[in-house]
Regions:
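Charged, low-complexity intrinsically disordered terminal segments
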Residues: 2-254
């Protein structure tokens, strides 16, 4: 009888360890999933303000300082970017990669695409913070950035949305500094595979408009992503990336 109990206990622990990966956006305190979350940190602030899908009526104070390692939305959402989990994989891009001296890039884009290898679960984090997050080295918010204003957006998505995101990112040529997403997960995503391999679009079109939706079955949010390459004749010779995001109470252009 006792042996049977321990067998059940072992199985229970294994199930929890297997399925507890974080590959979705999180609520204000990082204690539950959210379809989307946005943090705006004004210059000189530590916590910033947050609005998220579960409490979209108004902005609230952040649950913790962004430098805290836990108990706030983005610390939890990035839990398996800064730490290991066998079923959570990601691609990270940043024009100022962690631990790399100042380098010149063609893009200012910063973000992370996270997915689960054992479920149709993913998230896209877009932000403005240089040197953040550092892959697999623990949560480490760059405290020097508290003096500056920053925006962080997290969208919970299905894996099928990743290819459209990649199609837009291809044009702006982000600097990818980490990718451990297995090709078996992206076999049907030609744009993502080109992005991961560092391929550059040299043929028109040089502008892109992609549309994705968040995962919520009850109230999904539509997101339009506009991008333009340096080869585009429809503007100055620079890379640009614009994301329009709205819900009933929120509108952002990033």
């Amino acid at each position: 009888m006792m042996l049977a109990f321990f067998n059940v206990l072992t199985l229970f622990l294994f199930i929890n360890l297997t399925y507890s990966q974080t590959t979705k956006c999180q609520n204000r305190a990082g204690g539950g999933e959210a379809d989307w979350a946005i943090v705006y940190k004004a210059p000189g602030q530590d916590n910033g303000k947050i609005i998220e899908a579960n409490d979209a009526a108004a902005w609230n104070n952040g649950a913790q300082a962004l430098s805290n390692r836990d108990q706030h939305s983005f610390a939890k959402a990035l839990e398996h970017v800064v730490g290991d989990h066998q079923n959570a994989k990601f691609l990270a891009y940043n024009n100022a990669p962690p631990g790399v001296p100042s380098i010149k890039t063609k893009s200012n884009s910063k973000g992370v695409i996270i997915l689960a290898t054992n479920a149709d679960s993913a998230a896209w984090v877009v932000h403005t913070v240089p040197g953040f997050p550092a892959a697999k080295t623990g949560y480490n918010w760059p405290v020097a950035e508290n003096a500056r204003g920053h925006l962080l957006i997290c969208l919970t998505i299905l894996e099928s949305q990743i290819n459209a995101i990649a199609a837009s990112l291809l044009l702006v040529q982000p600097l990818i500094h980490y990718n451990d997403i297995p090709k078996t997960e992206t076999a049907g995503m030609p744009y993502f595979n080109k992005l991961a391999e560092g391929k550059i679009s040299t043929l028109p079109p040089f502008t892109s408009r992609q549309t994705i939706r968040t995962q919520s079955g009850a109230a999904p949010v539509t997101v339009h992503i506009y991008s333009k390459s340096e080869s585009s004749k429809y503007g100055e010779h620079e890379l640009s990336f614009i994301c329009y995001f709205w819900s009933k109470s929120t509108f952002f252009k990033v």
